[in-house]
Regions:
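Sequence context surrounding c-type heme c attachment/ligation sites in exported
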Residues: 26-47, 63-154
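Short, structured beta-strand/loop micro-motifs enriched in basic residues and often containing a Trp
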Residues: 47-58
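Bacterial N-terminal signal peptides
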Residues: 10-18
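Bacterial N-terminal signal peptides that target proteins for export
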Residues: 1-10, 91
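Boundary at the C-terminal end of the N-terminal hydrophobic targeting segment
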Residues: 21-25
Length: 154
């Protein structure tokens, strides 16, 4: 599948991706998925979620390294319409940042990962957007807080 078929508005997002330099700042939604690779699709809670990560991060994993700081994982959640992607519900980003996650309570902290969530119009959701994400990903400490780490490696 081509990205444009999965993410028809990718071109409208622009062409650049800016990494977050300081921990504690909400990650930015990439302006484009250029340089990202689709690595997983999951269905949960009436949603279909496609996940993307930078090709350079996958290459690091495949060469036996851990995911480097600056790694961004983008999730695009669609309404599940009988097994087909409906409208985009939200965009989610996890970004691994040196000393990241320090502003989250220890009970939900996910290592150095920062999280953010965005509306279909790409506006940052600020009223408790990621508590559910943090709680769920906390269970994946053994895989750098990621679901699908093995898919990234293959």
């Amino acid at each position: 599948m081509e990205l444009r078929n999965l993410f028809p508005v990718a071109g409208a997002l622009g062409a650049a991706f800016f990494l977050i330099a300081d921990a504690g700042a909400a990650p930015s939604l990439p302006a484009s998925l250029n340089g990202f690779v689709h690595y997983s699709t999951s269905n949960y809670g009436g949603k279909i979620s496609d996940k993307y990560v930078q090709k350079t991060s996958i290459q690091a994993l495949q060469s036996g390294k851990t995911l480097p700081n600056g790694t961004a994982v983008v999730g695009i959640e669609y309404r599940d319409q009988n097994g087909k992607r409906g409208p985009v519900l939200r965009y989610i980003i996890m970004e691994k940042v040196r000393n990241g996650g320090k502003d989250y309570p220890a009970s939900v902290r996910n290592g150095d990962w920062e999280f953010a969530s965005f509306t279909p119009a790409r506006a940052l959701i600020t009223n408790d957007p990621v508590t559910r994400c943090l709680a769920c990903h906390k269970s994946q400490a053994q895989s750098d807080y990621l679901f699908g780490l093995n898919e990234m490696k293959s």
